[in-house]
Regions:
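Positively charged, solvent-exposed patches that mediate nucleic-acid binding
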Residues: 1-134
Length: 134
């Protein structure tokens, strides 16, 4: 039994440095810093990125009251979280903060596949821009 716990702890420790381990932005200051970085707007969402010195991928989600009532905002954020979980391990880069902002109507009503494609194309565009600035 103790050996199983040790193995579980080792797996957990090794996954902390993985690219699939997404850290969530929670502090207002982190969101403000991300807003000063590069932005890409599309019909379904706004994506903001900014470099961080941590060497990890951090992601934040926000939806204003313009998106709808609490139920609609939470549904939009759930969809954005699902997209980030699927796309960032493959298309995100270590050392960047990402903020996904939901848009009125379209974040909730658009097909999931379309949302994901919009997010991936936004990431590719923003990473090309970030290379040009460096």
């Amino acid at each position: 039994m103790a050996q199983q716990l040790d193995n579980a702890e080792n797996k957990k420790a090794s996954s902390n440095t993985s690219k699939t381990d997404l850290h969530t932005l929670t502090k207002r200051q982190d969101f403000i810093l991300a807003s000063r970085g590069l932005k890409h707007s599309c019909e379904t969402m706004i994506v903001q990125i900014n470099k961080n010195d941590l060497g990890t991928i951090r992601v934040g989600f926000t939806c204003s009251k313009k998106v709808g009532n609490a139920v609609v905002r939470n549904r939009a954020k759930r969809r954005l979280r699902a997209i980030a979980r699927e796309a960032l391990p493959n298309f995100g880069r270590l050392g960047f903060d990402y903020v996904l902002i939901g848009r009125y109507g379209s974040t909730v009503s658009t097909e999931f596949k379309t949302l994901k494609n919009d997010f991936i194309s936004a990431l590719e565009t923003l990473h090309l821009k970030s290379k040009g600035e460096a």
